[in-house]
Every structure is written in C-alpha cells, then in structure tokens.
Amino acid sequence: MFRIRYILIFVILLLLGFKIKGELPIESAKYLRAALANADLQPPERKTKYTKYDFAPLWLKTPNFSILGFIGFNYQRIRIKLLSATKDSTHPDTYFIAGKSAVGNNICDFNGTITIRHVRELRNLETRVDETISPARQEGILLAEYYLSENKTQAKAGVFTGIMRTNWYINKKGALCYDDISSASDSFCNNQFIGTWTAYRDNKPLRCNWGDYRVSNSGNLDIGAGEFSPDNKYLAQGWQSYSQAWIYGNENIQQQEEKAWW
C-alpha cells in the first residue's frame, strides 16, 4: 500500500512540474514567481498550445557581442555562446543545447537542456515606435529551466542552472518571432538567464546571469540609461574592452569584440 501511495505522489509531482532532485537557485525561483505574477500576462497557462513551435531560432538569433553576462559577486564578465539548440522530437518542451563559455581567456564547452515550464500570453499587444498597429497576432513570454554542464576535463569547469525567459510573438502570418517590438526602449532585453554556476571542484555556487542587450538583476554593474554601460569600478573585471568598444566607440576594439572567440 505504501509503495502504491509513493508512486502516486511521484507521478503527481511530475505532472505538476516539480523537481524531484535539487531545487532552483533562490534568485531563479524568485524571478520565476515575479514573472508569472506580472499583471501584463493573461492568467491561463499556454504551454501545451505553444510547444508545437520551435523556439530554438530565437535563442540563436542575437549577435554574440550583444549577449552580456556576469559571474560572481564582483560582476566578472562572462561570455556565453549557444552553438546549437535542437528540439527533442519525443518531448516537445525539451531542447538539447551545445555551446561555449568564456571568462577571460578560459573557454569551456558545455552541453545540456532547456526545458519549457510555462508559456503565457500578454493581455495587450505592443507596437513599434511611430506605429499604431502591432506586427503581432499574439505576444507572450516563455519561462524555462536550463541545465548546462561544462566539460569536466577542462580548466575551471562547472554547471549552469536556473530559469530563462524569452519574449516572443506570433506574426500575422502565424510564424513564431523573436520579440524585438520594443527594441527602441531603453530597457529592452530578451533571452534572460538567471541562475548560478557551480564549480565541479568545490560545489560552491556563484551568481551567474546573462542575456541579450541587458542583464537581469545586475545590480550596480549596469549604469546605462539608453543602453548597457558597465560602471567604471567593474572595468577591471573584464569589461574594459566592452566599454572602450561600445561606450567610447573605439572601432578597432569593436572589431575585436565582434570576432568569434568560440
């Protein structure tokens, strides 16, 4: 009887989307709750409706020099490149991920998964600057868990875990699109990853967030008004070249920032 009850509880937890092993990082769980509580979203869960779409192209779209990230309490710069994202043909809410990370000159390969947990629709469609009609037929957000494991044979390797958010829209032709409708706004961002990186060697987690154009929960790292701009006190943490390239317009360093480091 006990065994049957245990199995039933296990199945119920799986159906509800709870994790049997491990928990989300605290910051990730808080971000998830806040995102789902946003009054701009319609309450109904729409995951089943949208898993028929392939979200992978939305995660591979942004030029890498516009993907910004930090690791640790001192906001050390980290660069992340997703090389591939492949939808699981059996489980449409799961994607297999391959990519690379770089902190300074230390580069690691990683593989893992992104698993969709929630999809919600916006109550109101956004419009571009100087337009009165939205290009979207529907607009919304995706919230997913990610687990990205770096190659254990490489130096300073570990595991990235957390929650990611992607803003999307369906255009008038029914195609899924990367949501850049509000790209002219000062706070525009997309594909936000909020979580931790945990080293294999000591199992100690460090905050590690990244995303397109801005970084969520970046504290006083980002002091930019119209665009991301690292505070001068963090330039020594890997942000010097970024600042010279994009804040001060050094074209030679811009070319270096745009080079494929992966």
Which sequence ranges carry the predicted segments?
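Tryptophan-anchored aromatic micro-motifs
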Residues: L24-L83, D93, I97-A102, D130-K152, ...
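Mid-length scaffold segments of soluble, non-membrane domains
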Residues: T94, S101-T115, L122-L125, S134, ...
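Exposed beta-sheet edge/beta-hairpin loop segments within beta-rich domains
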Residues: I181-S187
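Extended lipid/amphipathic-ligand handling interfaces
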Residues: I114-H118, I163-K173, D180-I181
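Short, solvent-exposed mixed-charge patches
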Residues: A260-W262
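Long, charge-rich, low-complexity intrinsically disordered regions
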Residues: Y200, Y213-S216
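Bacterial Sec-dependent N-terminal signal peptides
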Residues: M1-P25
